[in-house]
């Protein structure tokens, strides 16, 4: 039973990642305010290294939420940082 949920969850995650990739292709490098980005994606959008983004997150320069061992950054927070 639990394996069925894991497999279904995995399939859902694959679908979501595919949908997000499609949105990225359609909208290009535009930062979507309601999208949640990983620190790596944020770094790519900002044209910097991931470690730089993580330093700014830890310093409070860019607002983010820690999810497990990773940070997630709302697109509107990236826009806010860029407009400073």
Curated annotation (Swiss-Prot):
Source domain of life: Bacteria
First-listed, main subcellular location of the protein, grouped into a coarse class: other
The entry's keywords: Biomineralization, Magnetosome
UniProt keyword annotation of Coiled coil present: no
InterPro entries to which the protein is assigned, alphabetical: HTH_17, SinI_DNA-bd
Phenotype reported upon loss of the gene: Normal magnetic response, slightly smaller, sometime scattered magnetosomes. Deletion of approximately 80 kb of DNA, including this operon, leads to cells that are non-magnetic, lack internal membrane systems, grow poorly, have reduced mobility and take-up and accumulate iron poorly.
UniProt entry tagged with the keyword Signal: no
Up-regulation conditions: Part of the probable 17 gene mamAB operon.
One Pfam family recorded for the sequence: HTH_17
GO molecular function, one term: DNA binding
Localization, UniProt: Magnetosome
GO cellular component, one term: magnetosome
Family statement drawn from the similarity comment of this UniProt entry: Belongs to the magnetosome MamR family.
Other facts noted in the record for this chain: This bacteria makes up to 60 cubo-octahedral magnetosomes of about 45 nm in diameter which contain membrane-bound crystals of magnetite (Fe(3)O(4)). Expression of just the minimal mamAB gene cluster (MGMSRv2__2365 to MGMSRv2__2381), including this gene, is sufficient to form a minimal magnetosome chain with small magnetite particles.
Annotated function: May play a role in controlling magnetite number and size. Coexpression of mamLQRBIEMO in a deletion of the 17 gene mamAB operon restores magnetosome vesicle formation but not magnetite biosynthesis.
Name of the protein this chain belongs to: Magnetosome protein MamR
């Amino acid at each position: 039973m639990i394996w069925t949920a894991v497999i279904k969850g995995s399939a859902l995650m694959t679908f979501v990642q595919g949908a997000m990739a499609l949105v990225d292709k359609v909208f290009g490098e535009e930062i979507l305010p309601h999208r949640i980005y990983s620190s790596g994606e944020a770094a790519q959008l900002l044209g910097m290294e991931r470690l730089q983004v993580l330093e700014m997150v830890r310093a409070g320069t860019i607002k983010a939420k820690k999810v497990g061992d990773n940070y997630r950054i709302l697109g509107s927070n990236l826009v806010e940082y860029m407009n400073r």
